[in-house]
Swiss-Prot record:
One annotated GO biological process: toxic metabolite repair
Membrane-spanning intervals of the chain: none
Entries under PANTHER family matching the protein: METHYLTHIORIBOSE-1-PHOSPHATE ISOMERASE
Coiled-coil ranges per UniProt: none
Annotated binding of substrate, by residue: 49-51, 92, 199, 250-251
Primary enzyme class: isomerase
Family membership noted in the UniProt record: Belongs to the EIF-2B alpha/beta/delta subunits family. DrdI subfamily.
Active site, renumbered: 240
Protein name according to UniProt: 5-deoxyribose 1-phosphate isomerase
The reaction(s) this protein catalyses: 5-deoxy-alpha-D-ribose 1-phosphate = 5-deoxy-D-ribulose 1-phosphate; 5-(methylsulfanyl)-alpha-D-ribose 1-phosphate = 5-(methylsulfanyl)-D-ribulose 1-phosphate
Organism whose genome encodes this protein: Bacillus thuringiensis serovar kurstaki (strain ATCC 35866 / NRRL B-4488 / HD73)
Pathway(s): Carbohydrate degradation
Inactivation phenotype: Cells lacking this gene show no impaired growth on minimal medium but addition of 5-deoxyribose inhibits growth at a higher level than wild-type. Moreover, the intracellular level of 5-deoxy-D-ribulose 1-phosphate increases in wild-type cells supplied with 5-deoxyribose, but not in the deletion mutant cells.
Site location (Transition state stabilizer): 160
C-alpha cells in the first residue's frame, strides 16, 4: 500500500523546512530553520543526512546566514559570505557535495558583486533553489541509467540510505527502484540495517515500504548468507565522495559489502551525482573520514549495550577500492574502468 511520500527538504515561508530524520521511523516531524547556525546543527546532528541533500541544505544556509546582513559595501558582504561558507563547511567533513554547494554559492556572490546588496541576497536564494531543482533532475537521470542494468524480478541489495530521504527526490541508489515501480517491475530489495545509526532499516525500508516497493530488512552480518543463497543479483549503493581513481567513500560497512559482492561475483554499482565526484582527490586514502561519538555504538537507544567505559571506534564512513566497483552510475551516464580516465571524460 502506497503512502504519502516523505519530503526531506523544502523552502517554505522564507525558511528551510527539514524532515527530522533522527526521529524516523517512529515520528514524522518537520522543523523550520531560519539561521545558518541552526542549519549547521541540523547537518551535524544528522537531522538532515545524505550528501546531496546536505549540499542543498548548506546552500540555503548561506542565504540564511547573510539574509539579515546590514553591511552596505561589496567587500563587507563578500567577507560575510565567505565567513558563512567557511562555518557551514565545518558541519561534516566527508560529503563533498557540501563543499561543492558552498563553493558554488560563494562564486555566485562574487560573480554578481556589481548588484546591490538586496539584489545579491535575492540572487543567492535563487541559486540555492536552482541547486535544489537540479538535484531532482539528476536523481531521475541516474535512475534511468541504472535501470538499464536491472530487469524485472531482480534481487537487489542496498546499504545505508541513498534514497529520497538523502536527496530531494527519488534518491540515487533507490532511483531505479522507484522507476522500476513506475514500469510495473517487481524488484525484491534487501536493505542492510546499517549499524550503528540504522539508516537502512529506519530510513530506506521506511521510504520504500511507503512507496509500495518490496523491501526486506536484514542485519549487516546477514549479507553474506543472503548472497550465498542466490537472492542477490546486484548491489547498488550511494556515496559521499568519489576519488579521481574511482575509490568511493560511503557509509561504514560498504567496504565489507563490496568484498562480499566480489567474492560471489555479484555486480557492485555506485550511484553518484557528478557533484559527488572529486577529481582533486587522487585516491580514497586522501578522503577525510568523520569519526562520531561513542554513544552511537554503545548507547543507541538510551540503554547501554556495552560497558559504559568501553573504548569505541566509530568511523562514519569507509572507503571501497575501485577494484571492487563494477560501475559508477552518474546523471551523465554509466562509467566503468579505467575510472581515472573515464571519470574525467564525463566532465569534458
Amino acid at each position: 500500500m502506497m503512502e504519502e511520500q516523505l519530503i526531506p527538504i523544502q523552502w517554505k515561508d522564507d525558511a528551510l523546512v527539514l524532515l527530522d530524520q533522527t526521529l524516523l521511523p517512529n515520528e514524522i516531524v518537520y522543523e523550520s530553520f531560519k539561521t545558518a547556525e541552526s542549519v549547521w546543527d541540523a547537518i551535524q546532528v544528522m537531522k538532515v543526512r545524505g550528501a546531496p541533500v546536505i549540499g542543498v541544505s548548506a546552500a540555503y544556509g548561506v542565504y540564511l546566514g547573510v539574509k539579515e546582513f546590514a553591511e552596505s559595501t561589496e567587500e563587507g558582504f563578500m567577507d560575510e559570505v565567505r565567513k558563512v561558507c567557511t562555518y557551514l563547511a565545518t558541519s561534516r567533513p566527508t560529503a563533498v557535495n557540501l563543499f561543492w554547494a558552498l563553493e558554488r554559492m560563494e562564486s555566485v556572490a562574487a560573480d554578481n558583486i556589481h548588484l546591490s546588496i538586496s539584489q545579491l541576497k535575492d540572487r543567492l536564494l535563487e541559486e540555492a533553489k536552482e541547486i535544489h531543482r537540479e538535484d531532482e533532475e539528476i536523481n531521475r537521470q541516474i535512475g534511468e541509467h541504472a535501470l538499464t542494468l536491472f530487469h524485472d524480478g531482480m534481487g537487489v541489495l542496498t546499504h545505508c540510505n541513498a534514497g529520497a530521504l538523502a536527496t530531494t527526490k527519488y534518491g540515487t541508489a533507490t532511483a531505479p527502484m522507484y522507476l522500476a515501480k513506475e514500469k510495473g517491475w517487481d524488484l525484491k530489495i534487501f536493505s542492510d540495517e546499517t549499524r550503528p545509526r540504522l539508516q537502512g532499516s529506519t530510513l530506506t525500508a521506511l521510504e520504500l515500504q511507503r512507496a509500495g516497493i518490496d523491501v526486506t530488512v536484514i542485519t549487516d552480518n546477514m549479507a553474506a548468507m543472503v548472497m550465498s543463497q542466490g537472492k542477490i543479483d546486484a548491489v547498488i549503493v550511494g556515496c559521499d565522495r568519489v576519488a579521481a581513481n574511482g575509490d568511493i567513500a560511503n557509509k561504514i560497512g560498504t567496504l565489507g559489502v563490496s568484498i562480499l559482492a566480489k567474492y560471489y561475483n555479484i555486480p557492485f554499482y555506485v550511484a553518484a551525482p557528478t557533484p559527488t565526484i572529486d577529481l582533486k582527490t587522487p585516491t580514497g586514502k586522501e578522503i577525510p573520514i568523520e569519526e562520531r561519538d561513542a554513544s552511537e555504538v554503545i548507547n543507541r537507544f538510551g540503554q547501554y549495550s556495552a560497558p559504559k567505559e568501553s573504548k569505541v571506534y566509530n568511523p562514519a564512513f569507509d572507503v571501497t577500492p575501485h577494484e571492487n566497483v563494477t560501475a559508477i552510475i552518474t546523471e551523465k551516464g554509466i562509467v566503468k574502468a579505467p575510472f581515472t580516465e573515464n571519470l574525467k571524460k564525463i566532465f569534458q
